[in-house]
């Protein structure tokens, strides 16, 4: 694989807050970023070197974009596959279209995890109401129906408890290809963020404990309260996934904690909300690490600078900014979004505590 030295231009598919923070991390390393996406006035466009506003299916715009950059990465996994494949035919795309395709489809993702020996909740493929009825009889009444595609922040899923509302649930999800998973009563949720470089070297951050509100990540704390053996196993799972995918870049693996064991939930082929604390809380942020990995630079240290806690500012939470800034030691990141809608991530704050003090 080709490495790209400082002075190269990185194309980023998607112009949201992740593209924004990637652009901010790339600049000190000597890289310029060109954002491509359909959204007018994207948050990343406020800090990136260049912006193209065009549809992901616009081949003319994609060709012009590809001719202006040296390599392409992405800020979210729901970029149309045809867009990524079109670009990959003419320019390096990292992570690969194959990694993206695995993450885009929940069934393929679960089958992949199972194929490498990673434990998952029991699941079944659903293509009809008949499939749903059969699957519930096999898995049990307490379950989660999820669309195979376009699911994030709690979207595209319905919790079921019995067969009374199967028809309605199937209709509510649009009667699209789905999976039914057994509902897992877990003790906690963690994520492991790992980076894999062009030469196959891998480094991971300590596991992160996550708490959600309304199915959206609310707070992340690192390091998670795990035993040394659990920490090693969680990192080993993320490492195994990255190696099996021949992955390049930052990868986030979400796991359910159940007793001493872990069950795979999903992976994100990109920088991740649960890693935002790393901007102030680690020697190398996840955003800088991603740039290093995709460009072939040496990976940076993932050592913690203290115990860290990241809290998302969602919707009207952003109105607390002045109060939060009055708190000593709070690090504020606003994403440049103008409208504070319900369930919209407007920014985040990070608090860093001495390693001897538990937040």
Residue ranges and their predicted role:
Residues 1-108, 130:
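ATP-binding N-terminal substructure of ATP-dependent carboxylate-amine bond-forming enzymes
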Residues 3, 334-359:
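Generic C-terminus detector
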Residues 27, 87-88, 114, 137, ...:
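Anion (oxyanion) recognition and catalysis
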Residues 102-191, 195-241, 357:
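Active-site nucleotide/adenylate-binding loops and adjacent lid/helix of ATP-dependent enzymes
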Residues 160-162, 196, 313-316, 349-354:
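Short beta-strand-to-loop capping motifs
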Residues 172-226, 231-264, 268-276, 291-301, ...:
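Phosphate-binding core of ATP-grasp and ATP-grasp-like enzymes
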Residues 303-313:
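Short glycine-/aliphatic-rich beta-strand segments at the starts of folded cytosolic domains
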